[in-house]
C-alpha cells in the first residue's frame, strides 16, 4: 500500500462512533460494519506508516472519527438534489488552505461536529459553517473533503496532488 483513498458511502455503523446515537432512525439503513472496520484499520495503518491519505465524503467522517472526533448525525439543507452534481455550496477557506474552491457540490446529511485530534479546518460552508475540508497537521499529506471532487474537473489539482504524493512514496 502506497497511500489511502477513502470514498463516500453509507453512514458509519453506530458501534464505531464515539458518541451516543439518541435517534437511530436518522442513520442510513444500509450501514456496513465490515467496511467500517476495514476503513478504520486502514486509516490507522496508513497513519502509522506516514502514507498519503485522501478522504472523500464518508471518508472524511471516518478520518475524523478515527482521530477521535464526532459527527453531527443529521443536518438539514446539505442533501438537496441540485447540490449533488452542481457546484452550488459557497465556501469560505482558511488563509493557508491547500486547495481552494469558491463553491462545491456538497450533498450529505452528516458532517463533522467535534474535530478529531490534529485536524485543522481548511474550508467550511459559507451559509452555516458546516466543515467541508480538513487537513491533518504536521503530516505529509492527510486531506479530507466532505464534497465530491470526483464529480467535476475543477478539482483535478486535488487529485494530481494526491497522486504525486503516491508516486513519491514509491521511491
Where in the sequence are the language-model features?
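Flexible gly/pro-rich beta->alpha loop and the following alpha-helix that scaffold active-site loops
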Residues: 1-54, 67-68, 72
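Amide-donor transfer/coupling interface in amidating biosynthetic enzymes
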Residues: 1-7, 35-51, 76-171
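Conserved G/P- and acidic residue-centered "switch" motifs that form tight phosphate/ATP-binding loops
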Residues: 57
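Catalytic nucleophile loop
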Residues: 60
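Structured adenosyl-cofactor binding patch, chiefly the S-adenosyl-L-methionine
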Residues: 63-64
Amino acid at each position: 500500500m502506497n497511500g489511502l483513498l477513502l470514498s463516500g458511502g453509507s453512514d458509519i455503523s453506530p458501534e464505531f462512533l464515539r458518541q451516543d446515537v439518541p435517534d437511530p432512525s436518522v442513520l442510513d439503513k444500509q450501514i456496513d460494519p465490515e467496511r467500517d472496520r476495514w476503513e478504520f484499520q486502514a486509516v490507522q495503518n496508513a497513519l502509522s506508516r506516514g502514507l498519503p491519505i485522501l478522504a472523500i465524503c464518508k471518508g472524511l467522517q471516518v478520518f475524523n472519527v478515527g482521530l477521535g472526533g464526532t459527527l453531527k448525525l443529521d443536518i438539514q439543507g446539505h442533501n438537496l438534489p441540485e447540490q449533488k452534481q452542481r457546484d452550488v455550496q459557497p465556501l469560505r477557506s482558511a488563509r493557508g488552505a491547500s486547495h481552494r474552491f469558491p463553491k462545491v457540490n456538497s450533498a450529505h446529511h452528516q458532517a463533522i461536529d467535534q474535530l478529531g485530534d490534529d485536524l485543522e479546518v481548511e474550508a467550511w460552508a459559507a451559509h452555516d459553517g458546516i466543515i467541508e475540508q480538513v487537513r491533518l497537521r504536521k503530516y505529509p499529506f492527510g486531506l479530507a473533503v466532505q464534497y465530491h471532487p470526483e464529480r467535476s474537473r475543477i478539482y483535478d489539482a486535488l487529485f494530481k496532488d494526491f497522486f504525486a504524493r503516491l508516486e513519491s512514496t514509491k521511491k
